[in-house]
């Protein structure tokens, strides 16, 4: 029997995803037409003998999360539960805190994955690889190749080329270590908790040695904060227990709002083989479709509109006559009036783009000439200026007719009256 754990973080995390995360927990943000974490759940549901999926995070349970979990259970026929941390405990602290729930039923192994990654999720090949490399006493990291410069932004893995054993692991090194990076997807045997317990005990000992701040009440919490990458993998490396399974499939982090459009492109391209029914096509009396496009069945799209490539249109969206949409995500209830143009943009829930308005951003795609290039997590500002990126319209934003919004972030509930360029509109 197998299980899976998906680490979904909490409201203090994912701040680079604002203003979109103001309205919905980041794991529920729709990417390629479905909530981000649903891609993980669907991949887990296809693993033979996987009986339960546990979501661990420190979001307060709410109606949106509960409703999503109920629907996902019914659709994928697998038990799904949400376990709420009392505080941010780190990637290792969360699973250690809920180790009894993870180990109940006696799973032979369990997957752990971060919610903010986009991947083909080669879980079954990882499982086969795990059985061939030690089984009950071994642990597997999913790795992929990055270029030398970008590898410094990730956990770097030095491995034995023959056995794939991890010999050395460094999280975000200061100098080049390896071009094999950690994808944030793992397969553990239950014995991993022995190693996490050692870190917990070490944290307790260090706290006792440095317990000069006795008035603080967070001492127990500090011992429970454990990071798999820095605290566990670094000590396991080189001891014949930690292995890397390298994938050549698509993979990306979803840290910023701009990376959601790139992730949507990757998932839409997968739909041609995994879910062709989700992709729209040009039909007589319908809009012109170019490339991979998802249109929710309840959306109203004028036949003269042109959509694609890489467009996702959400529930209840209205797309008027002559509208052009490319490389964009249009969220629930948005209205794009006649002849508006939306490029490299996320249009928020219930927002409105007026007639003949143009809303455009700058794509933050990986270098197309480098097969190992990843999407850069750009800082919001560079040299005092807003870094050109995709345009984001928050929830319930109104754009008037015949204006241009370029490379800007518009916070929720704003009614604009003129054009803006390279600005954050508060």
Curated annotation (Swiss-Prot):
Q: Which InterPro entries match?
A: GMPPB_C (IPR056729), Hexapep_transf_CS (IPR018357), Mannose-1P_guanyltransferase (IPR050486), NTP_transferase_dom (IPR005835), Nucleotide-diphossugar_trans (IPR029044)
Which EC number(s) does the record attach to this protein?
Answer: 2.7.7.13
Listed GO biological process terms? GDP-mannose biosynthetic process
In terms of Pfam families, this protein maps to: GMPPB_C, NTP_transferase
| One Gene Ontology MF term | mannose-1-phosphate guanylyltransferase (GTP) activity
Superkingdom as given in the UniProt entry: Eukaryota
Record's keyword terms, sorted: GTP-binding, Nucleotide-binding, Nucleotidyltransferase, Transferase
EC supergroup of this enzyme = transferase
Name the reaction it catalyses.
Answer: alpha-D-mannose 1-phosphate + GTP + H(+) = GDP-alpha-D-mannose + diphosphate
Pathway of action: Nucleotide-sugar biosynthesis; GDP-alpha-D-mannose biosynthesis; GDP-alpha-D-mannose from alpha-D-mannose 1-phosphate (GTP route): step 1/1
Q: What GO terms fall under cellular component here?
A: cytoplasm
- Statement: the UniProt record of this protein carries the keyword Transferase: yes
UniProt similarity note = Belongs to the transferase hexapeptide repeat family.
Record protein name field: Mannose-1-phosphate guanyltransferase alpha-B
Taxonomic lineage per UniProt?
A: Eukaryota, Metazoa, Chordata, Craniata, Vertebrata
């Amino acid at each position: 029997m197998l299980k899976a754990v998906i680490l979904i973080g909490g409201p203090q995390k994912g701040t680079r995803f604002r203003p979109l995360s103001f309205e919905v927990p980041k794991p529920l943000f729709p990417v390629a037409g479905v909530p981000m974490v649903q891609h993980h759940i669907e991949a887990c549901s296809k693993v033979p003998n996987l009986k339960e999926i546990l979501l661990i995070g420190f979001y307060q349970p709410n109606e949106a999360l509960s409703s999503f979990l109920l629907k996902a259970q019914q659709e994928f026929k697998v038990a799904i539960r949400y376990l709420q941390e009392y505080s941010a405990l780190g990637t290792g602290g969360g699973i250690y805190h809920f180790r009894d729930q993870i180990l109940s039923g006696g799973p032979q192994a369990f997957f752990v994955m971060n919610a903010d990654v986009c991947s083909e999720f080669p879980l079954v090949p990882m499982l086969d690889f795990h059985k061939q490399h030690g089984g009950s006493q071994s642990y597997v990291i999913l790795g992929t190749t990055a270029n030398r410069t970008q590898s410094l932004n990730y956990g770097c893995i030095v491995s034995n080329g023959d056995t794939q054993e991890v010999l050395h692991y460094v999280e975000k090194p200061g100098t080049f270590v390896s071009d094999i990076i950690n994808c944030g997807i793992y397969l553990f045997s239950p014995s991993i908790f022995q190693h996490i317990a050692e870190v917990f005990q070490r944290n307790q000992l260090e706290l006792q040695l440095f317990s000069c701040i006795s008035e603080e009440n967070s001492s127990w919490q500090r011992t429970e904060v454990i990071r798999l990458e820095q605290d566990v993998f670094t000590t396991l490396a080189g001891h014949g227990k930690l292995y890397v399974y390298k994938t050549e499939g698509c993979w990306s982090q979803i840290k910023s709002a701009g990376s959601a459009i790139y992730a949507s492109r990757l998932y839409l391209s997968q739909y041609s083989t995994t879910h062709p029914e989700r992709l729209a096509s040009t039909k007589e009396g319908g809009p012109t479709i170019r490339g991979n496009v998802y249109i929710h069945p309840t959306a109203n799209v004028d036949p003269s509109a042109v959509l694609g490539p890489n467009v996702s249109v959400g529930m209840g969206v209205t797309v008027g006559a002559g509208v052009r949409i490319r490389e964009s995500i249009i969220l629930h209830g948005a209205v794009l009036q006649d002849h508006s143009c939306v490029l490299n943009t996320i249009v928020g829930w219930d927002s409105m783009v007026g007639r003949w308005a143009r809303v455009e951003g700058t794509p933050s795609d990986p270098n197309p000439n480098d097969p190992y290039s990843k999407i850069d997590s750009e800082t919001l500002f560079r040299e005092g200026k807003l870094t050109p990126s995709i345009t984001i319209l928050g929830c319930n934003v109104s754009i008037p007719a015949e204006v241009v919004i370029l490379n800007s972030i518009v916070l929720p509930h704003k009614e604009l009256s003129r054009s803006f360029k390279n600005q954050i509109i508060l």
